[in-house]
Curated annotation (Swiss-Prot):
Function: GLC7 phosphatase-regulatory protein involved in GLC7 subcellular redistribution and chromosome segregation.
Basic and acidic residues bias (residue ranges): 427-437
Entry protein name: GLC7-interacting protein 4
Bias (Polar residues): 522-541, 569-590
Subcellular location field: Cytoplasm
Compositionally biased residues, Low complexity: 438-477, 511-521
Native species: Kluyveromyces lactis (strain ATCC 8585 / CBS 2359 / DSM 70799 / NBRC 1267 / NRRL Y-1140 / WM37) (Yeast)
């Protein structure tokens, strides 16, 4: 029991799946053969019935093409049946009696021998248009197929009994049955549907039975076979191949999700073997059909007249070489046959696991699909070239030329077409390389931009502008880290100041339950010391990112407007403490100072600029959650004024700086509850709630990650706001929002939203 439990625990087989063994492989081979033979018998019956019903017409069944469509490993069930099919393919009669074979359940031989085809076109055409011979061959083919079908039906019954008796049972005590419906879409012999059209009506015996007539008839046969192949035979295999390819490229938990979405995923290995076997069968059918068309017409295809009518003789010559290789050799299929044999080991079991599926994909499905794709491409090229030659032959431009002249013209055409073909290949490679480079450049651009955005949003020290650090540092001195030039500074233009005579309406918001309303800044600061509220550390990080984005955009806008040869102007920071009701004289002095700063020219060094950057400070008032409702008359939101110089104006020495007052804001946590807030219970049996229950539990790891992602997205959305929203607003917080919503109100809203969440 312990050994079984350990084995089941170590196995990664998907629950509910069915493993593949040697018995199931034989079941797949037998099932595929039965489906093919049943369809072949049906086609023979339909053709013979049409011949009997239309006996007054001169209809000839193309039995040799029907035999080629029905060729495959299914006739390897017996050496006698294999020999009969070979004789029928050569227009020779054979016995049609039933074969008595001992009942056995051995595996099938998947190699298909090449049947000799008559190369003499005159002899082949005489047999091809012989109605009695073709009808006799069709009748014999039906009987041989029925005999083979009976043998397979007896074998599949015996094999099913052996499988049910030898296969281990599941937890319920039942044996998993071999579901043939799971293989229907992959094993359906759709190529035999083309055989129903293989009846030729001969109207004029003298003209319709010549070698030229057979050459003209072979083209529509090839085109219909090509259409049937591309529309009915290949799509099921291509679709399943694509799904398995997607699965093989996934790993881990995702591979299981892709696996269970496949049709009949429990029989995945069975379906992969069936699809590979079906591809092998289609390759044999394509070779048999091409041999029946190409070999009798070989002298026509290699004739100089045909070559001169080709669109590109170099491509046509390569096509003929490929046809020779494909029709007369089977070298490319040796590796595939060996792969099929490796899965035929009697004591091997393949579980539905990622490794086994990937191995079957590489060794069976991928190889067979690639070979099938090459064979189908060869049929397409052959049909296209032949169609072009047939259209060009209607002009008859070379009828009056002798053999030597045509041979010389063919050599010249080959040289010219080879150069054109090479130029075409180079152009295609160049376009492919350009497309590849453009895609790589786009990918690198997108990746670099994403890296830049990630670094700008992630590589920020929380100690630079956190309220906790501002509260613990002195109002006069700052550390080098907080005074670095990379520290974010909010910018506002001097022209954006509003005089005291103008009015501004500020939108009010709902009050937080953890914040108290006070009439002045000092009352607010002192009243919060004993209040309960959530930590604003995350909100300060959000504020920090918003300020940094505003500073980056303002600096970029400033550099763009200055031009490449101009040096930065002197920046003067004037940090003012918030005043609930500023006086008119104070505003006038600020306006006068701003006008002087705007008139400055580019007279200051970059070192001077850096020193001024070090002296810039963040106004702590922007971090204070204010609940003041400003009256519509004469009220104004506090601002941080940083003046910049314009390139087209003169300098002035009337610059004056105002000492800034930095106020400490308390964001150091939540004090313990007072006795008034949490009194001792006076009733019997009551007890005081533990202090830990008054505070929220620490968030989980995924919550922290989600919160961090939300913060990054918030900073990214803020960075997408356009810089210049008006001629009078060059940069700063106020240029990012509407006139009714200032920078302070926006930051307060962000902090409150995080508190409520």
């Amino acid at each position: 029991m312990l050994a079984k439990a350990a084995a089941s625990a170590s196995s990664s087989m998907e629950k509910g799946s069915v493993y593949l063994d040697f018995t199931d492989i034989k079941c797949i081979q037998y099932t595929s053969s039965i489906r093919k033979l049943e369809q072949l018998v049906h086609v023979c019956k339909v053709l013979l019935r049409n011949l009997s019903m239309k006996s007054n017409e001169n209809l000839i069944p193309l039995s040799n093409i029907v035999i080629a469509l029905g060729s495959g490993f299914q006739f390897n069930v017996s050496a006698a049946i294999e020999k009969r099919i070979e004789l029928l393919s050569q227009f020779r009669s054979c016995k049609a009696n039933a074969t008595n074979l001992p009942l056995s359940t051995t595996s099938l031989k998947l190699e298909v021998d090449l049947v000799p085809v008559e190369e003499d076109s005159v002899l082949f055409v005489s047999k091809f248009y012989n109605k009695e011979l073709q009808s006799q061959l069709l009748t014999t083919l039906q009987r041989v197929a029925e005999d083979s079908l009976q043998i397979y039906q007896a074998r599949i019954r015996q094999l099913t009994m052996e499988r049910n008796s030898n296969r281990p049972t599941d937890l319920s005590g039942r044996t998993t049955i071999f579901n043939e419906d799971a293989l229907n879409d992959l094993l359906s012999p759709n190529e035999l549907a083309f055989g129903l059209d293989l009846l030729v009506n001969i109207r004029n015996r003298s003209t319709d039975t010549s070698s030229s007539a057979f050459f003209a008839l072979a083209l529509p046969i090839l085109e219909k076979f090509r259409s049937n192949l591309n529309d009915k035979c290949i799509p099921p295999i291509r679709s399943y191949y694509t799904s398995i390819m997607k699965f093989s490229r996934t790993k881990g938990v995702f591979s299981n999700n892709v696996l269970i979405q496949l049709p009949y995923w429990q029989f995945t290995l069975h379906r992969m073997y069936a699809a590979s076997l079906r591809a092998k069968c289609l390759i044999d059918v394509i070779r048999a059909v091409l041999r029946q068309i190409y070999i009798p017409n070989k002298h026509h295809f290699h004739d100089n007249t045909t070559k001169l009518h080709s669109k590109n003789l170099h491509e046509y010559s390569e096509l003929l070489e490929e046809l020779e290789t494909f029709c007369f050799t089977q070298e490319l299929e040796k590796d595939l046959i060996e792969a099929f044999k490796s899965y035929g080991n009697q004591n091997t079991v393949y579980q539905v696991q990622f490794n086994n599926i990937s191995s079957a994909y590489q060794r069976l499905l991928l190889k067979s699909t690639q070979m099938l794709r090459k064979a189908a491409k060869l049929v397409d090229s052959f049909s296209t070239q032949w169609k072009s030659i047939s259209d060009n032959m209607k002009a008859s431009k070379y009828d009056d030329m002798n053999i030597d002249e045509m041979a010389k013209m063919a050599e010249e055409k080959l040289a010219v077409d080879e150069l054109a073909y090479n130029e075409k290949i180079k152009e295609q490679e160049r376009q492919r390389e350009e497309k590849k480079n453009s895609s790589l450049s786009q990918k690198n651009t997108s990746s670099s931009s994403s890296i830049t955005s990630n670094s700008s949003s992630l590589n920020v020290s929380p100690n630079i502008l956190s309220p906790l650090r501002l509260s613990r540092t002195s109002s006069v001195s700052r550390s080098e880290e907080s005074r670095s030039p990379s520290s974010p500074i909010p910018f506002t233009d001097a022209k954006s100041n509003i005089s005291a005579k103008k009015t501004r309406s500020v939108r009010t918001r709902n009050r937080s339950s953890s914040l108290q309303s006070v009439s002045s800044l000092e009352d607010t600061s002192t009243a919060r010391n004993g209040m309960r509220s959530n930590s604003l550390q995350s909100g300060s990080l959000n504020t920090q990112r918003i300020v940094q984005n505003a500073y980056s955009k303002a600096l970029l806008s400033l550099n763009e407007k200055r031009g490449p040869r101009l040096t930065p102007t002197k920046l003067n920071n004037s940090i003012r403490s918030k005043s609930p009701s500023p006086t008119v004289s104070r505003q006038n002095s600020v306006k006068q100072r701003n006008k002087v700063n705007i008139l400055k020219l580019n007279e200051v060094d970059e070192d001077d600029i850096n020193e001024k950057f070090h002296d810039l400070k963040l106004d702590d008032d922007t971090l204070i959650v204010s609940q003041e409702v400003l009256s519509p008359e004469g009220s104004e939101t506090p601002k941080i004024i940083v003046s910049v110089a314009d390139d087209n104006q003169s300098s002035s020495n009337n610059d004056s700086e105002v000492e800034g007052i930095v106020k400490k804001v308390r964001f150091i946590g939540v004090p313990p509850m007072s006795q008034d807030e949490n009194p001792e219970p006076k009733r019997r049996g009551w007890y005081k709630k533990p202090a830990v229950l008054h505070y929220p539990p620490p968030p989980a790891q995924h919550s922290l990650q989600k919160f961090r992602t939300t913060q990054e997205g918030l900073a990214f959305r803020t960075s997408l706001i356009s810089r210049d929203q008006g001629s009078d607003k060059k940069f700063g917080f106020d240029s990012m929002y509407s006139s009714g919503q200032g920078a302070d109100t926006k930051i307060v809203g962000k902090i409150k939203d995080k508190l409520f969440k």
